[in-house]
Amino acid sequence: MPISKIHARSVYDSRGNPTVEVDVVTETGLHRAIVPSGASTGQHEAHELRDGDKSKWLGKGVLTAVKNVNETIGPAVIKENLDVKEQSKIDEFLNKLDGTPNKSNLGANAILGVSLAIAKAGAAEKGVPLYAHISDLAGTKKPYVLPVPFQNVLNGGSHAGGRLAFQEFMIVPDTASSFSEGLRQGAEVYHKLKALAKKKYGQSAGNVGDEGGVAPDIQTAEEALDLITEAIEQAGYTGKIHIAMDVASSEFYKPEEKKYDLDFKNPDSDPSKWLTYEQLADLYKSLAAKYPIVSIEDPFAEDDWEAWSYFYKTSDFQIVGDDLTVTNPLRIKKAIELKSCNALLLKVNQIGTLTESIQAAKDSYADGWGVMVSHRSGETEDVTIADISVGLRSGQIKTGAPARSERLAKLNQILRIEEELGENAVYAGQNFRKSVNL
């Protein structure tokens, strides 16, 4: 079925920054996708095209990317008369049209918007939900797997004020019997945590960060973990809800000294207190021994390969590569060869097409890795990643706290999918690292 129209416009993300929205029109109707954007972005990511005109949107406009869709990509795709169900051919065509390895010509934000909107058109033409279409494209087996929601309930690092260096502390309801029960448990812990934060750190500690987590003026990781552990206990889930961290350590790595500065938000940080990767690895291990930590993301900087391999050899929890791998096939291949981590954080806008995202997941699965599908800190009401997570059987999704509508939109979509699938789906639960084999 031919595409009759492709139209892009500039809309806003959850941080008030412009982003690209794409409409694709076929005989089945209008199919729309909105592209997210990140705050702490890896330098090896596909290129997000921003206008750079400081007089508008502080340089963050996306009018060039929108124009690229409306004047270059759209007309070329329509002229090519591609079948919307053949996602890999469409994405290959988009990449050829751009002609650069990192999509810097037309912009990954322009290309991804078109790729995802066409995927929705493909699902509609087949008369199936988007997750089912993605499952077909990826060749995943049945039953469907509903992911464990990794809920970012406490923010530090680049996402928050206080001195806390680590970026995200997540609760993991992996012993729940279903997705909906896991989400309920998470919401209950979140409310206890909010009340505790206000009580201990004052009323403003209940204010939420970019991803819905609280951001009290916390100094250390121990302090954050104690607060979360107490909230879990108050909610009655001790031993049932686990914890995950996203350290985002590239943000506080000192490449000259090859050290990590846990006081990086302090301009007068004392260099004698900066840590070597071995010292930082020991800190993680001591935290994992004391708290119920099941997953650590980006424990080391994106090009500190030696540190990753060192840590991997001696750890038994999930080690997730985000800035390290940036959903990029070449980086994933290198991480597999060097035995750097055992799970991929999958962000569709890091690579820029649905087909390449599916391939990144398959490459990771092939080496026994886990895959966690992720939002970005600048999100929208678009729920595509919920369908991607179910379609790929990823077993884990990270989409913020159970707060702020752009975060809940994804979680609510999985609730709908759970209801629709009924007995034809299983909850990943404690098998979240191996859910592709369930």
UniProtKB/Swiss-Prot annotation:
Q: In which pathway does it act?
A: Carbohydrate degradation; glycolysis; pyruvate from D-glyceraldehyde 3-phosphate: step 4/5
The primary site where this protein sits is cytoplasm
The cellular component terms of Gene Ontology attached to this UniProt record, alphabetical and capped at eight, are: phosphopyruvate hydratase complex
Tell me the first and last residues of the signal peptide: none
User: What highest taxon heads this organism's lineage?
Assistant: Eukaryota
Q: Which cofactor(s) does the record list? A: Mg(2+)
Catalyzed reaction equations: (2R)-2-phosphoglycerate = phosphoenolpyruvate + H2O
The keyword Membrane belongs to this UniProt entry's keyword annotation? no
Kindly list the places in or outside the cell where this protein is found, as annotated in its UniProt entry. Cytoplasm
Which residues are recorded as binding substrate? 159, 168, 297, 322, 374-377, 398
Q: What class of enzyme is it?
A: lyase
Some GO term, biological process aspect, for this entry: which one?
A: cellular response to osmotic stress
A Pfam family it matches: Enolase_C
EC numbers listed for it are: 4.2.1.11
Entry-linked NCBIfam families: eno
Job of this protein: Involved in osmoadaptation.
Similarity section: Belongs to the enolase family.
Q: PANTHER family annotated for this entry?
A: ENOLASE (PTHR11902:SF1)
**Protein name per UniProt:** Enolase
Whose protein is this, by species? Emericella nidulans (strain FGSC A4 / ATCC 38163 / CBS 112.46 / NRRL 194 / M139)
- The gene behind this protein is enoA
